[in-house]
């Protein structure tokens, strides 16, 4: 492949990185989809490594924090999303160890609670289903539901 194509792979990777952070595997995949050959991709990724523009650990931390702010999800869902981005298991584990699953679950539950019907039984059932679908484990869900419904009950008792 000619020199123009090699720099083109690097240029394309730099444009991708200008938009948002990417993991190494994600960049490689996008460059392959764009039609660059393996040699051009390898050279472009090597150059990005030299420039310290690819850091899977920082990328995993950034993704995890962003997902937690935008849409709090449990460990299982977050792991699956990071895996889709091509991150290795050890880096995913490091990123997830920095997350407080109880706090994420509570945040999601409190936000959802405002939209649920008034019936306490329906509220509890829908909240459990919602949190389960968000990928939280049963123990965290159980503790969180007990806590947020207890707080809500205490607040409504104070108003009476």
From Swiss-Prot:
List the keywords (alphabetical).
Answer: Cytoplasm
> Subcellular localization, per the record?
Cytoplasm
Chief localisation class: cytoplasm
One Pfam family hit:
RecX_HTH1
Single GO cellular component term = cytoplasm
Keyword Cytoplasm on this protein? yes
Keyword field contains Cytoplasm: yes
Q: Which GO terms describe its biological process?
A: regulation of DNA repair
So what family is this one in?
Answer: Belongs to the RecX family.
Job of this protein: Modulates RecA activity.
Q: What is this protein called?
A: Regulatory protein RecX
Q: Which organism is it from?
A: Chlorobaculum tepidum (strain ATCC 49652 / DSM 12025 / NBRC 103806 / TLS) (Chlorobium tepidum)
